[in-house]
Every structure is written in structure tokens, then in C-alpha cells.
Swiss-Prot record:
Monomer. Binds 30S ribosomal subunits, but not 50S ribosomal subunits or 70S ribosomes. The gene is rbfA. InterPro entries: KH_dom-like_a/b, RbfA, RbfA_dom_sf, Ribosome-bd_factorA_CS. One of its GO terms (biological process) is maturation of SSU-rRNA. GO terms for molecular function: ribosomal small subunit binding. PROSITE patterns: RBFA. This is Ribosome-binding factor A. It comes from the Bacteria. It comes from Desulfatibacillum aliphaticivorans.
Amino acid sequence: MKSIGRQDRVAGRIQQELSALIQKRINDPRLEWATITGVKMTKDLKIARVYYCVFGEEEKKIKVGEAFQQAHGFIKRELAKKLGLRYMPELEFFFDESFDYGRKIESILREIGPLDSPEEPEE
């Protein structure tokens, strides 16, 4: 079994604290639409890639991306206070397309419908 390394621990803390920060401290209504789906750290812990999803139309996705860019400095400062790391990683925000991709696959499977299993010949 693989042990959890420092990268994973720091990523988990950033995800947890950032989610709480969005819910409780940031007053931008655009970020209410966002859900943090994951954080990936570089090996040197200098960059945290934050992935988020937004349910809704394309316009909401764009607005949430803009809101993250505008709040970037505030978010980084607040996370630095909470995490107590020697070096606060640079935050990069990315839209997580896996949910949209999953919905697309699901709709295609629904269109196809259930597959009939081939009948076995009687002996």
C-alpha cells in the first residue's frame, strides 16, 4: 500500500482550507457556484494546481474563473495564515472538465439504451 506523501498531505490541506474559505470568507457570489474538486502539487511544492467545477452554463464557468483570478491574492494570503508552511505555493486555477465529460458519456449511453444480451441457443 502506498503511503501518503508530503505532496498529498499539503494538497489535501489546501483543498480543505480553500473550500472552507470559499464558503465562509469570500463574499464574491460568483464563487458560490464553484466546487473544489482537487489539488495537485508539484514535487517541489512550489505550485498548487487547483481544480474546480461549476454546474451550469458556459457563462458561469467563465465568471468563476475570473473571480478566482481577482481573489487570487486574498486566497493566497488567507491560505498562508491557515497552513503555516514555510513557503506558500503559487496557486493556479483550472476548470475540471471531467464532470462535463462524464455527463456527455452518460447522455450518449442513455441514447444508445440498454444492450440486449445475445440469446443462447437452446439445446
